[in-house]
UniProtKB/Swiss-Prot annotation:
It comes from Gallus gallus. Plays a role in neuronal differentiation. The gene is HMG20A. GO terms for biological process: regulation of gene expression. GO terms for cellular component: nucleus. Residues 1-114, 181-213 are annotated as: Disordered. Residues 34-47, 56-71 have a biased composition (Polar residues). This is High mobility group protein 20A. Gene3D superfamilies: High mobility group box domain.
Amino acid sequence: MENLVAGSTLPPLFADEDGSKEGSDVTVTGLAHSESSFTGGTSQPVNNPDLVEDLSQVQQLQNESTNTAENTEQKPEEEQQRTKRGGWAKGRKRKKPLRDSNAPKSPLTGYVRFMNERREQLRAKRPEVPFPEITRMLGNEWSKLPPEEKRRYLDEADRDKERYMRELEQYQKTEAYKVFSRKAQDRQKGKLHRQDGARQPVHDHEKEADTKERSVFDIPIFTEEFLNHSKAREAELRQLRKSNMEFEERNAALQKHVESMRTAVEKLEVDVIQERSRNTVLQQHLETLRQALTTSFAGVPLPGSGETPTMETIDSYMNRLHGIIMANPQENENLIATVRDVVNRLER
């Protein structure tokens, strides 16, 4: 019996937990292999009160130790995930940017005008397409749009921009703009003051001032400041590329417009030269006709006044002669016959 007690051992977890107790006297009875150690099916009672007589206690202690180890392993992982999780602080609200409700409406670019006009048409035509896909399709359509069709949107954008500049210039002279400017300056000062107080203690203000004055070339890489600086530069470059592309498209459209105008001007110049030549020929023919009429009607004085034509008065002479004949054709039959003879001689 003493050999059995000495040979039986507890699981490692149980032995570690009860190592401070009297572990030398603890034995486990009722195990399956103990039955084979006794012959005849007889067993002797164990009178030691420190013995563990139920395997459920061993299992319970082992489960508790396992759960404790798992909990200790999960806590660092949860804490690590909590530290990795960034973003806006819980319970903190984002402040809306200060907007001036009295300011004139900002102008829209030609691309935005095209998007606003075509978006509803495309959504009505294909309602199953999601919004991001519609935006992508409209972007491709704008890039493939001919410069002549883009010209309409760009011209509208230019007119809208001129309107905005005029209204903004007038608005900046009003009292409402001055009040809004003071509010914006006060808010910016308060924001800078709060940021300075939250980032650095009072005794580090001089060091912070020196840090702000340093050049962008002194920013250490792989830092939050460097990443923010890179993001700002990338955003600025994207905006510059976009503006450059718009100006190139506008320049190409203007170049085509200039070429078409130059061609039209050259054509008009040729037409003007031709018309001048034709007018010169007609003027010469008119002078020849006046001279012939003056010579032919020199012997035909006007009834009542006796006026005969000259090179300077041939036009008025012919008008008066026509008026006299049309007024009384029966009384001026002889005059009509004379005029017919003169005209027949001119045709020959």
